[in-house]
Amino acid sequence: MGFLRFFLTFLFGLGFLFPVSAGETVWYDYARSRAIPVKICFPSPVKKAPVILFSHGIGGSIESCAYLSNAWTAQGFVCVMVQHPGSDENIWKGKIRILNEFKGAYEENWSSRTRTEDLRFVLDCLERLVQSNEQFAARIDMDRIGVGGIDLGALAALLLAGQVPPDQGSSLYDPRIKAVLALSPPVRPMNISYRQVYQSITASALFITGTKDDGIVGPTKAEQRRIPFDAMRQSQRYLITLEGGDHRIYGGRVISFLGGKDDEKFQAGIVRSSSCFWRAVLREEPMAIRAMNSYDWASLVGVKASIERRSAQSTLVGSGSTMEIALPHLNRD
């Protein structure tokens, strides 16, 4: 317990001393005739830093989940927030029947193929910037890339990491991805087993869901959100299930009085756990690795939650276990 208190003091004390600068732009993918809004948040002082690519949920934008991008950037990560035309805020702004717009856009974008191709395009643009511009080369580490997202954004992140696409078309795997954060991942049955769907993912993964995390416009039920975690076999992975957490805790509520009294607590827990995960996997920080493998990891989350961990090819290691699991390819102190 003493170590975790010390680490949390470090994580949210010294870890937040980095000032933040941000810039917005639109990158045009001529091959697909798509304009992709992007917001890049850089930490200061200037030094090469790992990259976190983030994909919003249905109806979101580059401003979605600012609580995450602000926190991660303040801890020294480059955050790249990507907006997806066709499933972004423009589907509902100025509309009367908002729920119908959400449902229609969700079904049209269910496979997340277009979203995933957006993310790959943004990664390609970043690579070109690093190769052609010394200032970007000094700030962006393309060898340490993580990707995260909410719902359809989480699906896009998993597709980049090697999940079989829902449309069972060509693979969207991108070997540049080293870590995945899946917030409320959606699941639908296919004509192959879930083990086959997720078996190729090798990147370390953190899944976060809630006990009330039923889809609002999508069909996934709360108890199904854990399926990717259970089905994966080749990845070091973690699952946090927040007690009482619903589907709106991640990106905010359009109507603020519809619940949400504990949203700030849930979001603080998401920040704490995801920040520790990124620091362990992308920066290989010994204290973060120790915290991720702590017997009392629930203290890191800070809210009531169940915590589960599994290593590659392992059986379940649940909360309260006395087994310590080492993250693969990471240096231990």
Residue ranges and their predicted role:
Residues 30-140:
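Serine-hydrolase catalytic machinery in alpha/beta-hydrolase-like enzymes
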Residues 20-42, 177, 308, 321, ...:
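A domain-start/cap signature at the N-terminus of enzymes
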Residues 38-40, 51-54, 78-83, 144-148, ...:
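Structural recognition of the beta-strand scaffold that forms the well-ordered cores
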Residues 170-244:
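The feature captures the conserved acid-bearing segment of alpha/beta-hydrolase catalytic domains
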Residues 122-200:
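Primarily recognizes the serine-hydrolase "nucleophile elbow" in alpha/beta-hydrolase
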Residues 105-110, 191-194, 257-268:
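Active-site rim elements
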Residues 6-15:
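Bacterial N-terminal signal peptides
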Residues 244-248, 252-333:
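Alpha/beta-hydrolase-fold serine-hydrolase catalytic core, especially in secreted/extracellular enzymes
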